[in-house]
Amino acid sequence: MSSGANITYASRKRRKPVQKTVKPVPAEGIKSNPSKRHRDRLNTELDRLASLLPFPQDVINKLDKLSVLRLSVSYLRAKSFFDVALKSTPADRSRGQDQCRAQVRDWQDLQEGEFLLQALNGFVLVVTADALVFYASSTIQDYLGFQQSDVIHQSVYELIHTEDRAEFQRQLHWALNPSQCTDSAQGVDETHGLPQPAVYYTPDQLPPENTAFMERCFRCRLRCLLDNSSGFLAMNFQGRLKYLHGQNKKGKDGALLPPQLALFAIATPLQPPSILEIRTKNFIFRTKHKLDFTPIGCDAKGQLILGYTEVELCNKGSGYQFIHAADMLHCAESHIRMIKTGESGMTVFRLLAKHSRWRWVQSNARLIYRNGRPDYIIATQRPLTDEEGREHLQKRSMTLPFMFATGEAVLYEISSPFSPIMDPLPIRTKSNTSRKDWAPQSTPSKDSFHPNSLMSALIQQDESIYLCPPSSPAPLDSHFLMDSMSECGSWQGSFAVASNEALLKHEEIRHTQDVNLTLSGGPSELFPDNKNNDLYSIMRNLGIDFEDIRSMQNEEFFRTDSSGEVDFKDIDITDEILTYVQDSLNNSTLLNSACQQQPVSQHLSCMLQERLQLEQQQQLQQQHPTQTLEPQRQLCQVEVPQHELGQKTKHMQVNGMFASWNPAPPVSFSCPQQERKHYSLFSGLQGTAQEFPYKSEVDSMPYTQNFAPCNQSLLPEHSKGTQLDFPGRDFERSLHPNASNLEDFVSCLQVPENQRHGINSQSAMVSPQAYYAGAMSMYQCQAGPQHTPVDQMQYSPEIPGSQAFLSKFQSPSILNEAYSADLSSIGHLQTAAHLPRLAEAQPLPDITPSGFL
């Protein structure tokens, strides 16, 4: 600043430093210039001193030597003031140093001072009695455009309008009456450009510090680089005069001067901001870019919002690396529009902040010309909320292929190199996604694209920025998965008590799904209830893929080796099913209560096979009238999918006599006899040896796949005069009438419901003591102390067609030899051992009127 008519104001004084090159030290002792060695040592010390300043690295890199010395002196003076003002001794500081460091580490991300300054509508300014800026907050840049490092330890008069300097000098005096001339130019040293106070005051000459006489409130105009109209901004200063301790200044005689007064004030704009400025003044930031959108600068507000320093932002490379892949082409279109017209218009996109977080911003970029040619780009950005960003994304026109998933491959004529990232189905997290999963087999290299292209910028982005981990990542354990499966099983079991029509429809749908899964295969077979259930949604939200679910099911659900199984690989065993099976086998009350039954349609092939066995039993009964057949070796065993067992156990015995067969129309078929296969169905149950007295028989339960030959769609009728013997005790005749056709025969098939709890059904046929043949329990039939012989049941001779049915299937070549061998091996001793307990046995559920035990 000069005097008279040649008055100048403050401007940006920072100079861009020259890039320094480190020269190698010569191997031999070559003589060098002593003055050069002195300059090198001085520059080294200045660089070390600059690194200790509490400023960002980008600011330090642009400081000249005088600015480094000026800011170093200002920092030391401020430190001395706080040491005295806070009244802390060196001993106290040493004791609390460790605690302060721990608190700084704990609250490193919480910059309370920055938040207070942002909430303040203005900036903090401390001016000494000799008009030097002792301190200015960093928010001075938002109002005046000057950096904090530009004004500290500079004359405040360089910032004040010439017409307001006298008023400002008057406010600095404690009595509002400075002894010198009001013309500030006369009190200025031409050599240093600083006002020289005439008198230094002692505390005895000054009023108390806390008096109202020390309060100040005035207005003046300050130099503003952001105002293009007048270049000045009217500010209101409100504060008070306080002692500036710890300066240790000396007078002309060398004596130590007492602390002098200084103005501590808050400068706020005199003109109140508009509503829009109040909302956005703390969020709008500006960035500077090259013509190819490479960032070369960012203001302090942008560094606070994005979290980057200016050096980190400028050394990254292309600016498109900070843009979301789905918004790259949208921003590229605005970039081209700006090159053609000079302004991009409002563009909404996602900007990458630090710590891999995306921020929605609304940007408007302009071209800045120099000498008639475009020089650089200034982009003004305003952060948006996530809701506002989604609204703009929905309104965005999709006529152009802006989305990467739809347009990027078309533009570059290649497949997407980040297909796992853009895949919407599997939501992966860092914990369960390895690096190999992200590396596709045909990933193009960086050299195959132009370094300034969008694809090159996309490839240079880190894959982790597109990962979306949950806010509270909880480790996935097997208990959570088991609970989800149990809830799913309970939900399925609630449908078991519905009406018969709904049950049959549900079974038909599930059987159709099982057939489709078996035919299609693949990862979908892990979900037998299709992909619309709650379990599948939970798996997707947790980021579990099909392989993880398969391994979890093998470890937590199966608990058995399924390497030799054929059709049991899709079994989804739950705790509910295992508990129900175990209770059903252990509970003896199942055999002591009368049950009510409901008819249910069965598959034709099972009925044909059962009817064949009934006729086979008739022949054996006629040959051995005193021999009791062992029912467990004559039962038609069919496979029941385990995922249907949870509902089937609510209607029938666990042995699976009547499973859910495919309700296909009856057709003629012929199946050859197959070899028996043994499956250990209950090997996973704990405590079976103590709870089941016949564990060996249960574990070795035969699984047979024997199909009877049949060349007609309907059952032939029985011949007249054919008798069927029932060897056993406490047997009564069937309450059902004899059937003359297939419909009547099917109606005799009874399936109990709610047998375990004794719940009465609404539409059921009550048979208190009727004992039917055709099904059996897992337990062997044990005899009771009382037994009463009953007469044998005979078929009515009036039924036509019975003899034709027997004559057709009594051929030795057609009958199953496996059953004949087992029947022949049954002895009278084994039957007699179980006869005493027959009185305790009650009617078994799934039995036809004609059959065997």
Swiss-Prot record:
The protein's matches in Pfam families, at most eight in alphabetical order, are given as:
HLH (PF00010), PAS (PF00989), PAS_3 (PF08447)
Summed up, the tissue specificity of this protein is: Expressed in all tissues tested including brain, heart, kidney, liver, lung, spleen, skeletal muscle and thymus.
A GO BP entry: cell morphogenesis
Q: Which domain of life is it from?
A: Eukaryota
Q: Motif range for Nuclear localization signal 2?
A: 36-41
Which CDD domains does this UniProt record tie to the protein? bHLH-PAS_AhR, PAS
Gene Ontology terms, MF aspect: arachidonate omega-hydroxylase activity; aryl hydrocarbon receptor binding; cis-regulatory region sequence-specific DNA binding; DNA binding; DNA-binding transcription factor activity; DNA-binding transcription factor activity, RNA polymerase II-specific; E-box binding; Hsp90 protein binding
What UniProt keywords are attached to this protein's entry?
Answer: Activator, ADP-ribosylation, Biological rhythms, Cell cycle, Cytoplasm, DNA-binding, Nucleus, Receptor, Repeat, Repressor, Transcription, Transcription regulation
Query: Where would I find the bHLH domain in this sequence?
Result: 26-79
**Does the keyword field hold Acetylation?**
no
| Gene3D superfamilies registered for this protein in UniProt | Helix-loop-helix DNA-binding domain, PAS domain
From the record, give the transmembrane residue ranges: none
Cellular component per GO? aryl hydrocarbon receptor complex; cytoplasm; cytosol; nuclear aryl hydrocarbon receptor complex; nucleus; protein-containing complex
Residue span of region Disordered: 1-38, 429-451
Question: Which segments constitute the PAC domain?
Answer: 346-384
Coarse class of the protein's main subcellular location: cytoplasm
Annotated spans, DNA-binding:
37-65
Give the disulfide map.
Answer: none
PANTHER family for this protein? ARYL HYDROCARBON RECEPTOR
Q: How does it assemble?
A: Homodimer. Heterodimer; efficient DNA binding requires dimerization with another bHLH protein. Interacts with ARNT; the heterodimer ARNT:AHR binds to core DNA sequence 5'-TGCGTG-3' within the dioxin response element (DRE) of target gene promoters and activates their transcription. Binds MYBBP1A. Interacts with coactivators including SRC-1, RIP140 and NOCA7, and with the corepressor SMRT. Interacts with NEDD8 and IVNS1ABP. Interacts with BMAL1. Interacts with HSP90AB1. Interacts with TIPARP; leading to mono-ADP-ribosylation of AHR and subsequent inhibition of AHR.
Domain comment quoted from the record: The PAS 1 domain is essential for dimerization and also required for AHR:ARNT heterodimerization.
Q: Quote the function comment for this protein.
A: Ligand-activated transcription factor that enables cells to adapt to changing conditions by sensing compounds from the environment, diet, microbiome and cellular metabolism, and which plays important roles in development, immunity and cancer. Upon ligand binding, translocates into the nucleus, where it heterodimerizes with ARNT and induces transcription by binding to xenobiotic response elements (XRE). Regulates a variety of biological processes, including angiogenesis, hematopoiesis, drug and lipid metabolism, cell motility and immune modulation.
Q: What is this protein called?
A: Aryl hydrocarbon receptor
Q: Which organism is it from?
A: Rattus norvegicus (Rat)
